[in-house]
Amino acid sequence: MMLITILLFLAAGLAEIGGGYLVWLWLREAKPAGYGIAGALILIVYGILPTFQSFPSFGRVYAAYGGVFIVLAVLWGWLVDRKTPDLYDWIGAFICLIGVCVILFAPRG
């Protein structure tokens, strides 16, 4: 279950960031409309992926996903935009991952 949870979060994050990036390129950098259309379709996939999570609460899934998204966004900025994260970016991302673990795996009655 843990591996599926992680893979779904990673897939959703890449879909959200990748789709948003294509829309960004279309609107901000004058790329062809196909970029925007592809980005919109990928963003639809992003909306569907979290429904496959086994956790029953929408809010809990999206709150935990938010932490994963932050880490992926820092990595995207580093690898795609070539903007090297500083120490505080990494510390913040690590804190977010701790939050994800608390939200998803804390014992509940």
Curated annotation (Swiss-Prot):
Subcellular location: Cell membrane
Transmembrane spans: 6-26, 32-52, 61-81, 87-107
Coiled coil: none
Mode of membrane association: Multi-pass membrane protein
Keywords: Cell membrane, Membrane, Transmembrane, Transmembrane helix
Gene Ontology CC entries for this record: plasma membrane
Predominant subcellular localization, coarse grouping: membrane
Similarity field: Belongs to the UPF0060 family.
The protein's name in its UniProt record: UPF0060 membrane protein YfjF
